[in-house]
């Protein structure tokens, strides 16, 4: 993975792979011209025609960074060869979040099930210690 700096977000090009909650929130955050959006499920892209790009066009382009959504399985997705070839360019939405929130303490909870429950539990524990949450 390439090392990120805030300067990277000025002139570099990005492909966001995955149009779920994570991918769309990343798209909204980046809010720039040099961002393309792709999802294997074409229905996910119907409201984002200006940013959506076809697989055929992706294979002809060069990106500085590829932002891979958590739900994308690199070994089973339609762009697996492209991702393998560009493996060093792959970052996640969390990489971007941490870059822009270095001064804050963050607890990251990931996974398919139980995030809300674990988040609430951690919130209650920290609040009980009279800490600002």
How should these model regions be labeled?
Residues 1-15, 19-44:
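Hydrophobic, well-ordered beta-alpha structural blocks that scaffold small-molecule cofactor pockets
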Residues 36, 51-54, 91:
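General small-molecule cofactor/ligand-binding pocket signal
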Residues 43-46, 75-77:
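Short, glycine/polar-rich helix-capping loops at beta-to-alpha or helix-loop-helix junctions
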């Amino acid at each position: 993975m390439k090392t990120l700096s805030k300067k990277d977000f000025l002139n570099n090009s990005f492909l966001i792979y995955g149009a779920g909650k994570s991918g769309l929130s990343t798209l909204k955050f980046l809010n720039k011209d040099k961002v393309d959006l792709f999802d294997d499920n074409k229905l996910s892209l119907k409201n984002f025609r200006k940013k959506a790009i076809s697989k055929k066009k992706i294979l002809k382009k060069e990106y500085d960074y590829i932002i891979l959504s958590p739900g994308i399985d690199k070994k089973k997705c339609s762009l697996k060869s492209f991702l393998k070839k560009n493996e060093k360019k792959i970052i996640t939405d969390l990489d971007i979040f941490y870059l822009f929130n270095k001064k804050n303490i963050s607890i990251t909870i990931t996974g398919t099930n139980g995030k809300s429950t674990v988040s609430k539990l951690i919130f209650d524990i920290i609040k009980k210690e009279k800490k600002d949450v």
